[in-house]
A protein has these predicted regions:
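Start-transfer (signal-anchor) and selected internal transmembrane alpha helices
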Residues: 1-89, 300-316
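Membrane-interface anchor segments at the N-terminal boundary of transmembrane helices
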Residues: 35, 39-48, 153, 157, ...
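Short hydrophobic/aromatic helix or loop-helix immediately within or flanking a transmembrane segment
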Residues: 107-109, 124-151, 163-164
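Membrane-proximal stem/loop segments at transmembrane-domain junctions that anchor or position
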Residues: 114-119, 328-420
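Transmembrane-helix motifs of polytopic, lipid-linked glycan transferases
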Residues: 160-180, 218, 452-459
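Specific aromatic-rich, kink-prone transmembrane helix
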Residues: 172-175, 211-229, 241-245, 259-263, ...
Length: 726
């Protein structure tokens, strides 16, 4: 039994090591996928790997300097992280009222202001994504509380809530490392959080990606501190664990991954302890009386364990049942009958064209079937078709693309999402603007260093004979990687596992890596001294990373064309998050004026197209409907003037192509004025506006309807003339 257990443990760690190694290899060439050329001298890959080597060296050797630090230094580091987050919010970042976070928060506000606490059944997003009902209702009660205390502007409190959730996850990670390795290594983990870009990039994106972070670390920490104690203490511990597991699962279902990892770890530890006691009883030195007493204690431990497991299960089920009743109080199940089946996200995850990411065509495909059972059967059929078409080799390549998308890229899609606002803060350009090359290189270098030290930690765990507490975090990481190999591969889906990764990074620097480098140091110290010794250490690390990643980087540069980041020239809403302007704001608008300001991300002045969206198209009708004008904000020069009819508008919108010779080199705060004048007899073309008007924490341009300002988002979408590949 013990041999089987040891074999299963080694297999699990071997899979984890293999997955981490593959992601590390992909990450070493990931910097080439961001922009055509970050640095003009073409040394981007070399500089990234060299910077990663420097980070590894600082982690390995700088960690020892923190071993003598104590609690006061921990308080200082927490304050430093908090101040850095505040500085990032004020000087760099802007709110991200986009995509899923905006849909959830806007619906919560609509429930509060218009629907008397009931979810709107006409909201197609809420119809399809039932997994977000619980978090939407939580936001509803949060906004209701703010309204009751007199706070009507909810965006700042929402960001504060997000920051508190992230910092709570950091605190739980700190406590976990302190329990495993002592306060010195725990302080080193705080330094890693201070240096990690993910700590800052997603402060204004308030969604389950960040809100589930403390729940994941809470589940693992409560499992880590489990030990024999007084019965009432163990009961409190088990109830708290059950509540954290159940609520965390409702916030984001991926919380099931650390729950499974915790269960496997506790099972392995239980069986190993039972095997050790059994071997002790079988020894010739044990007296018969002691053996009988030990058997009685064993039966008592089994009974206590069964009671504790039963308590956790019962409390978890009670919390899940209560949360379901809470959702049912605000959601009429009879009206919400268009929810997607679970297999929908697996089917979408097998889409080669989107590399397993979100795909609108897949969503439309599933939505086209009336019942959930029909959706499930249709998604299964398409899933089988895609898997069969790819074959084993294509499937392996597809899994590699998904690992690259979710785990290997250092920005986790934070840079792209940070580009939606305008009137950028003073330091935005150096982090997410057109002068952010060095920050992007640093992000990728930190990701490479993190994966390298994580790999070292896993190798150290593999060499140990018994399951160490760190294995619980390794199993969580491996489970998350395998889960997103099958599931929809969102670029930001790994954010909630940042604490797990940084904990393993700290363990890698503290354990296996430190031992290896100490042995190497003995040879280096025998041949070098002073500054030469430090230079030799740096060269050894750099050469090691170059040897490991050089082939991957070279192969990528030789066999793949350069790719571009999808960057909006004018920063506004993207996608189909619009609604007809006539419905809620004006019955028959005659003149619409939309101001959009130029962003900082101009690339070689090749942006010259603007797309407008319309609703209620009538392609077979003729006659003039709208006169469209585009004026430059600086000198009011007319860059575009045309009258269009319904048959000129395609289903995906109407594209304005501004002549290149009229595009000028403009300041980052100058943009365009789009003017739509209704000249027809009836409204066959109704412009669309942003569908998140209730949030509007930071306007994406000014909208006028018949001369009156409306505090809304853009009615346009802007895109590059160049081919964009993400």
């Amino acid at each position: 039994m013990k041999g089987i257990l040891r074999g299963a443990y080694c297999v699990a760690l071997s899979i984890s090591i293999f997955l981490c190694g593959v992601i590390l290899a992909l990450s070493c060439r990931g910097i080439t996928l961001y922009k055509k050329e970050l640095l003009q001298n073409g040394m981007t890959v070399a500089i990234t790997l060299f910077m990663a080597a420097c980070i590894v060296m600082l982690c390995v050797y700088g960690k020892d300097k923190l071993q003598t630090t104590r609690r006061k230094f921990s308080v200082f580091l927490f304050l430093l992280i908090g101040l850095a987050q505040i500085a990032f919010l004020l000087l760099v970042s802007r709110p991200m009222t986009i995509a899923d976070p905006a849909r959830v928060q806007n619906e919560a506000l609509a429930m509060l202001k218009y629907h008397h606490g009931q979810m709107d059944p006409t909201n197609s997003y809420m119809q399809n994504y039932g997994n977000n009902h619980f978090i939407t209702i939580c936001f509803y009660y949060f906004y209701k509380f703010l309204t009751d205390v007199g706070i009507t502007k909810v965006w700042v409190p929402t960001v504060v809530l997000n920051v508190l959730a992230i910092d709570l996850g950091i605190l739980l990670t700190f406590l976990s490392v302190k329990k495993m390795r002592g306060i010195g290594t725990a302080n080193f983990a705080l330094v890693l959080f201070f240096l990690c870009p993910t700590t800052y990039l997603w402060l204004t994106s308030v969604y389950t990606n960040t809100l589930s972070f403390p729940f994941i670390m809470g589940v693992l920490y409560l499992g880590l501190i489990d030990k024999p104690a007084k019965r009432w203490r163990m009961a409190v511990h088990d109830v708290l664990l059950a509540v954290v597991m159940a609520v965390g699962y409702r916030v984001r279902p991926t919380t099931i991954i650390p729950i499974i990892a915790l269960g496997l770890y506790l099972t392995v530890r239980l069986i190993a302890g039972w095997q050790n006691r059994r071997a002790l009883r079988a020894s010739e030195t044990m007296e018969t009386e002691n053996a009988s007493e030990e058997q009685q204690h064993s039966r008592q431990r089994v009974l206590e364990g069964a009671v504790r497991v039963g308590l956790v299960v019962c409390v978890s089920m009670a919390v899940l049942f209560s949360s379901s009743n809470l959702v049912a109080k605000h959601v009429d199940a009879k009206k919400f009958n268009q929810q997607f089946p679970v297999v929908h996200w697996v089917m979408m995850g097998m889409n080669e064209k989107s590399k397993g990411g979100f795909n609108r065509n897949d969503r439309r495909y599933t939505s086209s079937f009336p019942t959930k059972e029909q959706k499930r059967k249709a998604d299964i059929a398409r899933l089988k078709q895609r898997v069969k078409k790819m074959g084993p080799v294509g499937l392996a390549k597809h899994f590699g693309n998904k690992m690259m998308r979710v785990w290997a890229m250092g920005d986790d899609d934070g840079i792209t999402n940070a580009q939606y606002a305008y009137q950028y803060p003073p330091f935005f350009r150096y982090f997410a603007g057109k002068q952010n090359a060095w920050f992007m290189i640093y992000m990728q270098a930190f990701r490479i260093a993190m994966l390298f030290l994580m790999l070292c930690a896993m190798c150290r765990q593999f060499l140990q004979r018994e399951a160490a507490p760190g294995a619980m975090y390794t199993l969580t990481f491996a489970g998350a990687v395998m889960f997103f190999m099958l599931w929809e591969a969102g670029k930001r889906y790994n954010i909630c596992f940042t604490g797990v990764c940084l904990l393993l990074m700290a363990e890698g620097a503290d354990g296996f890596t430190n031992t290896v480098f100490n042995k190497g140091d003995a040879w280096l110290k025998a041949h070098f001294n002073g500054m030469r010794l430090h230079a030799a250490r740096l060269v050894v690390l750099a050469v090691g990373l170059f040897c490991f990643a050089g082939s991957f980087a070279a192969a990528n540069q030789l066999s793949h064309p350069r790719t571009y980041v999808e960057i909006p020239y004018f920063n506004s809403k993207r996608g189909k998050d619009e609604e007809p302007i006539r419905w809620r704001y004006h019955k028959n608008p005659k003149v619409l004026e939309q101001t959009i300001e130029q962003g900082q991300l101009e690339w070689r002045n090749r942006w010259n197209r603007i797309r407008l969206y319309f609703w209620n198209l009538a392609p077979n009708e003729s006659g003039d409907e709208y006169r469209i004008q585009v004026l430059a904000l600086d000198d009011k020069e007319v860059l575009y003037d045309k009258t269009i009819a319904p048959n000129q508008v395609k289903r995906e919108g109407y594209t304005i192509a501004i002549a290149k010779n009229k595009l000028k080199q403009r300041d980052s705060q100058i943009g365009y004025l789009i003017r739509l004048t209704h000249v027809g007899a009836s409204d066959r073309l109704i412009p669309m506006i942003c569908r998140f008007p209730l949030l509007d924490p930071y306007p994406y341009g000014e909208l006028k309807v018949d001369g009156q300002y409306k505090d809304l988002g853009s009615i346009d979408e802007n895109f590059s003339q160049e081919k964009c590949i993400t």
